[in-house]
């Protein structure tokens, strides 16, 4: 169900009604009702449209909203010239194309967008329709106070759909880097930012066909970010970049000659 913030403007109400049509979800006027009351009457989750952000409340009690999350800290370090592990794993350069197959909150896509710059491109695929709407809206409207970061966020293209189906439609060698960051098999305690996503995560376990298609379309590399104990690195033939103090590693399949 979709509703508005407590004291909505006419624009907020119009936006909420438009979203209800786009998402095929019922619209309910707020009428000063509490989120808790509305959530009880909602068939599934509750999307609250506000002036500055959208909030999603789940039946399981989780609250999800877009925020640049750790990308803010990573962006500052990137601008200071520090080496970013993900960029090093991917081998990203200015002008490259980056396909993020598991967009989530978009933190990695944001850093990739900063690295590839205006001459490159970043596309993020998110299977959950509601999450894709929230993240797309956030990327295009959030004010960060950091010009380079904000511009990078605005450049990201968000697409809703299944990443395997999307990759299958792409020509050979059509992107530079294909990136996967599936929901961890084991929760990582320091990844609090993704905790609300667990209730919303689509069950799209990586499989061999998906990796094979990624290798086909990637000019430079296919990168997998996963828990350090994950069997998927070995299962799919990734060379692991081990980091002594990190709870997750990056695996790389080089596709360039």
From Swiss-Prot:
It comes from Bacillus subtilis (strain 168). The gene is ypiP. InterPro entries: 16SrRNA_methylTrfase_J, SAM-dependent_MTases_sf. It comes from the Bacteria. This is Uncharacterized protein YpiP. SUPFAM superfamilies: S-adenosyl-L-methionine-dependent methyltransferases (SSF53335). GO terms for molecular function: rRNA (guanine-N2-)-methyltransferase activity.
